[in-house]
């Protein structure tokens, strides 16, 4: 693991990991954390290259973000977690669940688009170019 994630944590109980979309950070969930923390140990994570988490040297891909999440859960000694993802956060959650299903309690997905066949080519190219640009800027 070449990065240390920034995160906001509040509450007790089953872990609920909040995963933001591209270009956002953990503060995306600031209005939900208090309510969710009444029943869960809420952890809002800044993914690689977002918010206060450094870019690092590894690939800037959804698969890498899923592997980053595995490393984060291991460091936090969390064996299983509920995952709530918005946009690319939903993509990360889906990828993580596909690779590490034994580590997932529940998935809550909002606006994910892991199957790129439904994305117009022009839009997909813009997304890929933005990721490449972010990689070069780091």
What annotation goes with each model-predicted range?
Residues 41, 102-103:
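Glycine-centered tight turns that cap/initiate beta-strands
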Residues 46, 82, 105-108:
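Residue in the alpha/beta-hydrolase core beta-strand immediately N-terminal to the catalytic nucleophile
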Residues 63-81:
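Conserved acidic catalytic loop of the alpha/beta-hydrolase fold
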Residues 6-58, 72:
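Conserved HGGG/HGGXW glycine-rich cap/lid loop of the alpha/beta-hydrolase fold
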Residues 24, 90, 114-115:
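Active-site micro-motifs of SAM-dependent methyltransferase domains
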Residues 94-99, 105-135:
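Flexible "cap/lid" loop of the alpha/beta hydrolase fold
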Residues 1-4:
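N-terminal cap/lid segment of alpha/beta-hydrolase-fold proteins
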Residues 85-89, 93:
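Gly/Ala-rich beta-loop-alpha elbow adjacent to hydrolase catalytic centers
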């Amino acid at each position: 693991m070449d990065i240390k994630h920034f995160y906001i944590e509040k509450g007790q109980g089953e872990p609920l990991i909040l995963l933001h979309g591209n270009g956002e950070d953990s503060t995306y969930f600031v209005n939900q954390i208090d309510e969710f923390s009444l029943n869960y140990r809420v952890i809002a994570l800044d993914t690689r290259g977002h918010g206060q988490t450094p870019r690092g040297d590894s690939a800037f891909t959804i698969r890498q973000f899923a592997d980053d999440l595995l490393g984060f859960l291991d460091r936090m000694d969390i064996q299983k977690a509920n995952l709530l993802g918005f946009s690319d956060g939903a993509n990360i959650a889906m990828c993580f669940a596909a690779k590490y299903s034994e580590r997932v309690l529940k998935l809550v997905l909002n606006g994910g688009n892991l199957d790129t066949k439904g994305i117009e080519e022009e839009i997909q190219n813009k997304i890929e170019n933005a990721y490449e640009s972010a990689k070069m800027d780091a």
